[in-house]
Amino acid sequence: PDDITSWNIEQYILPNTKEILFYILEQKDFWDTVQPMNGAVEALYRLVNDGYNIYIVTASDYRTIPAKLKCFFRLFPFIRQDQVVVTKEKQLLDLDVMIDDNPENLCHASYDKLLFDRPSNQWVDKEDLKRVYTWAEIYQFIKDNYPIRTVY
């Protein structure tokens, strides 16, 4: 929702309910209801078909990974398991481009940083971050700025 303006989820939930939240996120039926962002499937599919090597990097909590990845591969069947990296240290990866909606995941690295616009990151105003609003915009940025080669 638009009223969530921070990544600190604990400020939006009742005390002692964090475990309940993670329990919900661990459930397969929760992930059966998740839909990709508008244009995400099409943009990633086009980039893969154009010849780019795409890697998905997630900093998700380990408890949610099995159910989340099962959902992900259902929605993005053209992405292979070896194209998924699970790490909270995204800045350590040797990347060309990183797309994230959490600005903390884009700090302290040399790759191009695309900040996907969300209510939770409206406060961010950094010169080295390019704010993007749609997956079509992301697709065009990569096509315009990178010859076909590995893009992470």
Where are each of the predicted segments found?
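Generic surface-pattern signal
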Residues: 9, 13-15, 26-30, 143-151
